[in-house]
A protein has these predicted regions:
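Single conserved hydrophobic/aromatic residue that forms the stacking wall/gate
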Residues: 1-8, 12-13
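N-terminal phosphate/diphosphate-binding loop that engages ATP/GTP or pyrophosphate donors
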Residues: 14-81, 85, 92-93
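Hydrophobic anchor at the start of a short beta-strand
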Residues: 20-21, 101, 134, 162-163
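Short internal beta-strands
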Residues: 25, 135-138, 163-169
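Switch II (G3) loop of P-loop NTPases
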Residues: 87, 91-118
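Inter-motif core of Ras-like GTPase G domains
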Residues: 116-140
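Charged helix-capping and loop-helix junction motifs
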Residues: 116-124, 149-152, 177-182
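C-terminal lobe/tail of nucleotide-utilizing enzymes
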Residues: 153-220
Length: 220
């Protein structure tokens, strides 16, 4: 199956290209409740509606929390802490029915998904377990050099494959933002895959270039 960690909005392009596409996220917090008390997986709903996916919301994310906290803290207060086997099972089920699966990260690479009773689970553990190549998503503005370089060097040091960088909220001609991008490229050695302007509805990449970011993942 072909899976990758990419920005969720790319699904708009992939879905319209005629391929069978899907979305997956291990855990998401900061979600509203329906009138019946059940939680609405907000990020998943946004992708579903934006991309016009027929994929059911219920299979997009196995762990959904109300508090807008790091997932580990939300789970500590609300219960139902993330379990890696459950995350993997859900991912494999989505992969079995789709050609392309986009996996969105839960916070940054060092986001804790679980930390209680001596059990810990970090986003990097999920990426490694699911054998996902990744794309770093970053804001083009002030402070991005430090966050991008630290993320890239951490992932490279942990032998987690990184395909490149996508910059959000980009303003062409902005001196600082263009320098930020150049410095990130120079220091990390990673390609800049695209710079996404504010308000863009689609990822400014050719479908063939986008598809090349995905890799076949052996699921056993």
């Amino acid at each position: 199956e072909i899976c990758a960690c990419l920005v969720g909005s790319e699904m708009c392009i992939r879905d319209r290209s005629g391929e069978n596409a899907a979305y997956y996220k291990a855990a998401m917090s900061g979600n509203r409740r329906r009138s019946d008390g059940s939680l609405i997986p907000g990020d998943a709903m946004f992708v579903q509606q934006t991309a016009g996916l027929s994929q059911p919301l219920g299979e997009m994310c196995p762990y959904v929390y109300e508090h807008a906290w790091s997932p580990h803290l939300a789970a500590r207060y609300e219960g139902n802490p993330p379990e890696l086997p459950v995350i993997r099972q859900g991912f494999e089920a989505v992969c079995s029915r789709n050609d392309y699966v986009t996996v969105e990260g839960s916070g940054g690479i060092l986001c804790p998904l679980r930390a209680e009773n001596g059990k810990t689970l970090w986003l990097e553990d999920v990426i490694r377990a699911l054998q996902l190549p990744s794309v770093i998503i970053a804001d083009a503005g002030l402070g991005t050099i430090n966050s991008v370089v630290l993320t890239a060097e951490y992932m490279q040091g942990k032998k987690l494959p990184v395909k490149g960088i996508l910059f959000n909220h980009f303003h062409r001609g902005d001196t600082m933002e263009e320098d930020n991008i150049a410095m990130c490229r120079q220091r990390t050695g990673l390609p800049v895959l695209a710079c996404i302007p504010d308000g863009a509805q689609e990822l400014p990449m050719e479908p063939t270039d986008l598809a090349a970011l995905y890799e076949e993942v052996s699921l056993t």
